[in-house]
A protein has these predicted regions:
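Long helical/loop segments within the catalytic core of UDP-sugar-dependent glycosyltransferases
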Residues: 30, 102, 106-109, 116-132, ...
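A conserved acidic beta->alpha catalytic loop
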Residues: 78, 87-96, 119-120
Length: 218
């Protein structure tokens, strides 16, 4: 008797999950059809608020230099960007890699601060420390293995400035950095793309619920 009840419960759960997934998919399709005429606009903003970009890094010496360079090369006024690079309890060369990037001639005069952190709390601890140090109007967070596109920060700020009294956060889509490296990375990238472009979009279209990721947001 108990096994039969469990079987029925399992079947109902599976069908409900499939039905809910179908609802989200239809909602996402509706959203994309509604915005099919969207065109990218990169016209200059009337105002560029200062943004403090925080990058928590724990033993990321393989990728941190590329990430820091990508951030410093973004299409946003250089004097309106403060970059805080946290080498959080690192046992590798993350801190030295950050120093090397800051010393490059093309980044001379840029507002870059490198912190060799020994505190506790991991990423949450880093963000709490950064909050006390930040001098920008907004705080933007990127993971150490992120490589933001040129206009990433521009679009985040632009979205918030549409209604700064109501829009307290803005986030962008992410994709796998090395998506085409092998079968596993392609699968990971596909999972991220489906989650962000179907599930997140469907939830937003239905309930105006957005889920802020851990990177690429202000």
């Amino acid at each position: 008797m108990i096994s039969q009840i469990l079987m029925i419960f399992t079947l109902i759960s599976i069908w409900l999950s499939l039905a809910w997934g179908l609802v989200i998919l239809i909602s996402a399709v509706q959203f994309w059809l509604k915005h099919s005429d969207f065109r990218v606009d990169t016209s200059p903003l009337l105002y560029y608020p200062k943004v403090t970009i925080v990058v928590p890094a724990h033993n990321e010496d393989v990728v941190i230099a590329q990430t820091a360079k990508a951030i410093l090369d973004m299409n946003y006024p250089h004097d309106r960007v403060e970059l805080l690079l946290f080498a959080d309890n690192c046992s590798d060369r993350t801190y030295e890699e950050c120093l090397a990037v800051k010393a490059l001639p093309e980044y001379a005069g840029r507002d870059v601060t490198i912190i060799d952190r020994t505190g506790t709390g991991g990423k949450a601890g880093v963000l709490n420390d950064a909050l006390k140090m930040a001098t920008g109007d907004y705080i933007c967070v990127y993971d150490a293995d992120a490589m933001p596109e040129k206009n990433a920060l521009y679009f985040l700020v632009k979205e918030v400035l549409k209604d700064p009294e109501r829009h307290v956060a803005s986030f962008g889509r992410n994709k796998t950095r090395n998506a085409n490296q092998n079968f596993l990375t392609r699968c990971i990238n596909q999972e991220i793309v489906v989650t962000q472009r179907v599930h997140h979009v469907g939830m937003w279209n239905l309930f105006k619920i957005g889920r802020i990721p851990g990177t690429n947001f202000i």
